[in-house]
Structure formats: structure tokens, C-alpha cells
Amino acid sequence: MLIGINISPKDFYMSEVHTYRLENESDYFETENLTREAFWDVYKPGCSEHLVVRNMRKATCYIGELSYVCETQSKKIVGAIYCSETIILDEDKRHTVMCVGPIGVLPEYQKKGIGLRLLELSLVRAKELGYACAVLFGNPEYYRKAGFTDAARFGIHIADGSDMDAFMCCTLDADKLLLIKGCNQEDPIFFPDDAELAEYEKLFPPKEKHTLPGQIFA
């Protein structure tokens, strides 16, 4: 479980090859383009995650202290993680927890552990900030490596009260998490407007969309 590894709480962490640090405003367009490259044609033809990132930074739910990037020795940013607060609603009780994602790594740098290290840094810092848990939607096989498990095990469900394997939770404070149950209320930033996306796409080089096997929103 990666959250158990001792990571320095500094604003940056250096490996032999890469530097991990907090995102700066000067990184914004580069990391948005990175996110676009990372998610293009993965879940649907094209993607909208880069617009999610842009809108998240302007939202009240955004947690800038948990947004790390990975850069090479040549200062090229090859990975980035974004986190926000989400509400777990239990009738009239509202519990604020951490929501992970998007996490993006340039295709040519994937499968090198960069995404997991970014996640690790954010989880360690979130624990320091006092969050009870982190939730996300993602590949269960991948995120179990970072200590995530089915959110339903903790009594946490998606907005309509149902469960899905892709909705996962990682414990950061077990005592606090015992007091939390309910349904996740996804922020509207995760559902960008098609017209806004089309206009935003004009800022990037043209890129052909493809319908591919395995796309869940094709």
C-alpha cells in the first residue's frame, strides 16, 4: 500500500530521473495539453479531461496543494495529478472528502510508475491535511496497487445509491472514515459542456478522433 511509504512532505521530490513538484501557474497550458494527450481516445473518441482540469482550477472544490507534476531533467512535464473535494451525502449530513483525478501521463512515459508516484505524493499530503479518505473512478486492477478498494465496503456509493467496481476508496484516517457513509455528489466540473469543449479545442493542434474497442463512452 503506497500510502505507507515514507515520503518527504516538501513541495518537491526528486528521483534519479524525474522531479516531482507542485504545479505552477506557468505550467497550466503544458499540463492541459499533457492531459489531452494522455486521455485522447481512451474512454471515448477524443477526450474532455483537459477541460475538466482547466475548469477545476477555477472551482471552489479544487485542492491546489495536492496537484503535483512530474518533469524530466530537461524540464519537460510528463505527468500531472489533480484533486478536488467532493461531498458524500448521507441524508442531511454532508461529508467532505478528497476526490482524485484526472491523473495523466504522456503515452510514451506510461508504465514507468509515474502515475503511482504522483498519486502517492498526493495521498500523503492529503493525509497531512486531515482528509478521512480519497475516492476516485478508475481501473480497479491499477488502483489497488495504491491501496484503493471498493468504496461500497465503506458504505460509500455513487450518486444514485448504486455501486460500481470502478468507484474506489483509499483510507487516510480510519477513525474519521468510520463516521462517513452516503452517496458521492460529483461536481458539475466533471461534465463539461460540448460547446465549451469544441471552442476550447481550437487552442490545440488538430487531432483525429477514433472509435476504439474498450471505450466506455463511445
Predicted regions and their residues:
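A conserved beta-turn-beta hairpin within the catalytic core of GNAT-like acetyltransferases
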Residues: 87-100, 110
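A short beta-loop-alpha structural element at the N-terminal edge
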Residues: 18-31
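Acidic/histidine-enriched, glycine/proline-rich intrinsically disordered or flexible terminal extensions
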Residues: 175-218
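Active-site rim helix/loop that mediates acceptor-substrate recognition in acyltransferases
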Residues: 32-35, 39-73, 77-80, 87
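Conserved active-site alpha-helix within GNAT-family acetyltransferase domains
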Residues: 128-131, 138-162
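Conserved acetyl-CoA-binding loop-helix of GNAT-fold acetyltransferases
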Residues: 100, 105, 111-124, 135-136
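Short, Lys/Arg-enriched N-terminal segments with co-localized hydrophobic residues
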Residues: 3-13
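Conserved glycine-rich acetyl-CoA-binding loop
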Residues: 76, 106-117, 129, 145
